[in-house]
Amino acid sequence: MFKFNDEKGQLKCSFCGKTQDQVRKLVAGPGVYICDECIELCTEIVEEELGNEEEFEFKDVPKPVEIREILDEYVIGQDEAKKSLAVAVYNHYKRINSGSKIDDVELSKSNILMIGPTGSGKTLLAQTLARILNVPFAIADATSLTEAGYVGEDVENILLKLIQAADYDVERAEKGIIYIDEIDKIARKSENPSITRDVSGEGVQQALLKILEGTIASVPPQGGRKHPHQEFIQIDTTNILFICGGAFDGIEPIIKRRLGKKVIGFGAEMNQADVDEKNLLSKVLPEDLLKFGLIPEFIGRLPVITTLEPLDEQALIDILTKPKNAIVKQYKKMLELDGVELEFEEAALREIAKKAIERKTGARGLRSIIEGIMLDVMFELPSREDVQKCIITVDTVCGKKPPKLIRHDGTVVEHERKTSA
C-alpha cells in the first residue's frame, strides 16, 4: 500500500499524508511509510502512558512534615488544620501502599471533614494536597445532590468528575481525591427524623455512605440519571480520599450549650464567651455534628475532623503578598512584562483586607476587590510607554484617587479624571 502523490510521484506518509519533501525523514515498512513527525507524536503518546503508570505507584509519599512545608508555600495560617491534613493524607496513601492490611490488622480510610468559615482556605488546602501528590482531583457541590430518583444530581456524578479529571483512566481515578464543598447544606432539617422525605438532606447523606466507605460504584459515562440500557464505568472507591468541607453556620450555639454556657439571658458569662468565641469551632465533637443534622453513620465515615479559623486582617495581607501564587505577585509579574513596576502601599493592602472582612468573604473576596482596583490600570498601562512605575495608594483602594503613575524621568503623571470606586 504505497502512497504516491499523483502530480509528482512522491512518496507520502501513510498516517498524516505529508509528502517526502514536507518532512525530514520517511521510514519505509511493509507496504507503508511513516514520517519523523508521526514517529515523534507516537513516542510522546507512549511515554505519557508509561509516565502515568509510574506516577501512581506512590512509593515515595511525602512525610507529614514535608506535606506541611509545601502547604505553607500556598496557604497562610491554619497551622492545626495543615497538621491534621498532612497526617491524614500520609496515613491514607501509606494504607494504599500496604494493601490496607498488615499482619491481619485492617487499616480503615481516613476521610476528612473540614469545618471553617467562607474564604478560610478549605478548597485551597484540598487542591494543594492533590497537587503535592500529583493525583486526580475533583470538586463537587453537595447542594446540587439529591437522593436517587429525584430531580438533581446522583452522588455517582461526583465520581464521574474524578474520572474525567483522570482522563477516563479509572485506575488513576481510584487513587484520587474528591473535595465535597457545602457539606453542611445536606444536614437533616430537624434533629428528629422526619416523616416526609428529605431528598437533599438525609437522603443524600445515606446515598454518600457507600462511596465514602468503599464500594464498586456504577457511573454513567455521560453523567445524568441512570437508565437500564446504558453502559456504566465501574470504579472502586475504597482508595479514593474524600475531603468534605463546610461553614456549618449555626453550630456554635450547639457547642456553647454542650460546654454549659448560656446562649442568652441574664447572668450569661459574657466575658468568657467572648474569649472563647474565636476558638469555639476547634472544640467541636461528633455529638455536635449529630445535633446539627448529620446522621451518625455519615459522621462515622469522616473520622478526621479539623477546623479552620476565621482569617484576621494580618492573615489576609499575608495572603495577598506571601504565597507563591499570591495575587499581588501575579499582578506585579504581569505589569513587569509590560516594563512597569507595580507597588502596593502598606496602607492600601490593609484597606483591601478591611474591605474583605466587611464583606465576610474571607480570602475569596480579595481577588474581586483587587481586580476592581486594577481594571483601569491593566487596560491603560500597556499603551503607556512613558510610565515606569505604578503605585496603588489607600486613596486608590477607597476610590478617591487614581493610582500614582511615575515616568522614566521620575516625574508624576497628572490625572485629569478620577477612577471609579
From Swiss-Prot:
Entry binding sites for Zn(2+): C13, C16, C35, C38
Presence of the UniProt keyword Cytoplasm in the record: no
Positions of the ClpX-type ZB domain: 1-54
Record's keyword annotation contains NADP: no
InterPro entries documented for this protein: AAA+_ATPase, ATP-dep_Clp_protease_ClpX, ATPase_AAA_core, Clp_ATPase_C, Clp_protease_ATP-bd_su_ClpX, ClpX_bact, P-loop_NTPase, Znf_CppX_C4
A molecular function GO annotation: zinc ion binding
SUPFAM superfamilies per UniProt: Glucocorticoid receptor-like (DNA-binding domain), P-loop containing nucleoside triphosphate hydrolases
Family designation: Belongs to the ClpX chaperone family.
Leader sequence residues: none
PROSITE patterns reported for this sequence: CLPX_ZB
Sites where the protein binds ATP: P117, T118, G119, S120, G121, K122, T123, L124
Chain's role: ATP-dependent specificity component of the Clp protease. It directs the protease to specific substrates. Can perform chaperone functions in the absence of ClpP.
Organism: Geobacillus thermodenitrificans (strain NG80-2)
Subunit architecture: Component of the ClpX-ClpP complex. Forms a hexameric ring that, in the presence of ATP, binds to fourteen ClpP subunits assembled into a disk-like structure with a central cavity, resembling the structure of eukaryotic proteasomes.
Keywords linked to the UniProt accession: ATP-binding, Chaperone, Metal-binding, Nucleotide-binding, Zinc
NCBIfam families: clpX, PRK05342.1
Coiled-coil intervals: none
BP GO terms, sorted: cell division; proteolysis involved in protein catabolic process
Protein name: ATP-dependent Clp protease ATP-binding subunit ClpX
CC annotations in GO: HslUV protease complex
